Amino acid sequence: NTPGRQFTGASSHDPEVRRNPSLALDYIVAPPRMAHYIDWSTRVYSVYLKHVAPEDIYPYSIDEVFIDATSYLQTYHLSAREFARKIILDILQTTGITAAAGIGTNLYLAKVAMDIGAKHVPADEYGVRIAELDEMGYRRSFWTHRPLTDFWRVGKGYAAKLEAHGLYTMGDIARCSIGQPTDYHNEELLYKLFGVNAE
């Protein structure tokens, strides 16, 4: 499709290259600037401290934290979603960074809401994405979700082990965990495969 088999330019932007086959595929070399990332992470963290105490903030990575907002909802007279949005808008106003949030009834559900759910939530007028998840919502929305590697702490190795035993979804794993001792798929299989990590 390239006229005269010559490229007319180059782009590292996938949609642009797909739309225009006469563009050569290019790439960008972006050297890591850890001190810069730490500086911005510190700025965002200082916004959290305007709303919650440090003992309620659990850093997960340079760009992600868990916040136990339980005791603040009544103080601020806000729902979990409203409280998350308040913090996210403060981050945007203070730093110019658009943040997202996952809200859950436990850490795991908050992380799944963030990692999988927030990607499918339309952004509001400020680019904010907030996803909420409780146990029933998890069953409805993610019981049949694939691939397993989308889930927090399920890497390629774990997924391969599970799939080798016919377990392809979280629903499969949940059913396995309640299988009878005489069934092939039962709690013992999960402990045999993963030891204490089966919990």
Spell out what each predicted region is.
Residues 1-198:
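Gly/Gly-Pro- and Ser/Thr-rich, intrinsically disordered tail segments characteristic of DNA damage-repair
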